[in-house]
Curated annotation (Swiss-Prot):
This is NAD(P)H-hydrate epimerase. Catalyzes the epimerization of the S- and R-forms of NAD(P)HX, a damaged form of NAD(P)H that is a result of enzymatic or heat-dependent hydration. This is a prerequisite for the S-specific NAD(P)H-hydrate dehydratase to allow the repair of both epimers of NAD(P)HX. One of its GO terms (molecular function) is NAD(P)HX epimerase activity. Binds 1 potassium ion per subunit. It comes from Yarrowia lipolytica (strain CLIB 122 / E 150).
Length: 245
C-alpha cells in the first residue's frame, strides 16, 4: 500500500537552487551523477505506482530536455525498462557532456528506441508520457523545437507524469494561464516547489527525496516524510497551501 503523507511546505526557486548547490558542495558530498540517479529512480517508481500495468511491455514516451531534468528522464527510462516497460525517447536537443552521453549509451545498450520526431500518434500509441523537458531553472520563452511538444502535452489524453515542475510553468507562480498543460501526476524532487500549489485536485503528487539529511532538512525547514519499505517516493496530499520557504 502506498503511504500518503500530509501536506508539505514548498521551496522557492532560489531556495531550491541553493539547496542543490549545497548538496553538491564539498560539505554536501553528493555528485550530480548521484542526484540524477536518485531522481530518475524516484520518477520511475512513481510512474510504476501510477500504473503497474506498464510493466507488461507497454510503451512509455519519455520527453527529454537539454538540462538536468532531461537527465532525470533518461535515468527513469532505464529503470522502467528493467521493470518491464517499453520506453521510447524523444531527445531533440542533446547535451554533449560525458554524464549525458553515458546515459544515452546505457539506453542504446538496452535497445531503447530514440525518436526523430513526435506527433499526436506518438502520444496516442503510448500508455504513459514522462515530461522531463524543463526543471526548476526554466526561464521563458520556450524555444524550438519544444513549443510543439508543449502543445501536444496540452492536448493528449494519455496519462502524463512531470518531473519536478510541469514543463512551461513558472517554478514559483505555476501555469501562465488556464490553458496551460496540466500533468496527471507530478514527482517533486527533494521538496515540492511553489508551482505544485496549482496542480488540479485530481493530480497525483509524489515526492522523491529519500536522501535528505537532518542537517539539510533543518537548515531549509524541510519536512521529511516517512517512506515505506524500499520506496524512494511518498505520495503527498493535494491542495498544498503552505507558505513558501
Amino acid at each position: 500500500m502506498l503511504r500518503v503523507a500530509r501536506i508539505m511546505k514548498c521551496l522557492t526557486s532560489s531556495k531550491a537552487a541553493a539547496l542543490d548547490a549545497e548538496l553538491m558542495a564539498p560539505s554536501g558530498g553528493f555528485s550530480i551523477d548521484q542526484l540524477m540517479e536518485l531522481a530518475g529512480l524516484s520518477v520511475a517508481q512513481a510512474v510504476y505506482k501510477y500504473d503497474k500495468s506498464l510493466a507488461q511491455g507497454k510503451q512509455v514516451l519519455v520527453l527529454v530536455g537539454p538540462g538536468n531534468n532531461g537527465g532525470d528522464g533518461l535515468v527513469a527510462a532505464r529503470h522502467l525498462c528493467h521493470l518491464g516497460a517499453k520506453p521510447v525517447i524523444y531527445y531533440p536537443k542533446r547535451t554533449d557532456r560525458p554524464l549525458f552521453n553515458g546515459l544515452v549509451t546505457q539506453l542504446h545498450n538496452l535497445d531503447i528506441k530514440f525518436l526523430d520526431d513526435v506527433n499526436k500518434s506518438t502520444f496516442d500509441s503510448s500508455a504513459h508520457v514522462i515530461d522531463s523537458l524543463f526543471g526548476f531553472s526554466f526561464k521563458p520563452p520556450i524555444r524550438e523545437p519544444f513549443p510543439k511538444v508543449i502543445e501536444l502535452l496540452k492536448e493528449t489524453k494519455t496519462p502524463t507524469t512531470s518531473v519536478d515542475i510541469p514543463s512551461s510553468w513558472d517554478v514559483d507562480r505555476g501555469p501562465e494561464d488556464d490553458n496551460a498543460f496540466q500533468p496527471s501526476s507530478l514527482v517533486s524532487l527533494t521538496a515540492p516547489k511553489g508551482a505544485s500549489r496549482h496542480l488540479l485536485p485530481s493530480t497525483r503528487h509524489f515526492l522523491g527525496g529519500r536522501f535528505v539529511s537532518k542537517h539539510i532538512a533543518d537548515k531549509y525547514d524541510l519536512e521529511v516524510p516517512a517512506y515505506e519499505g524500499l520506496d524512494h517516493i511518498v505520495e503527498l496530499t493535494q491542495n498544498n497551501k503552505e507558505a513558501q520557504i
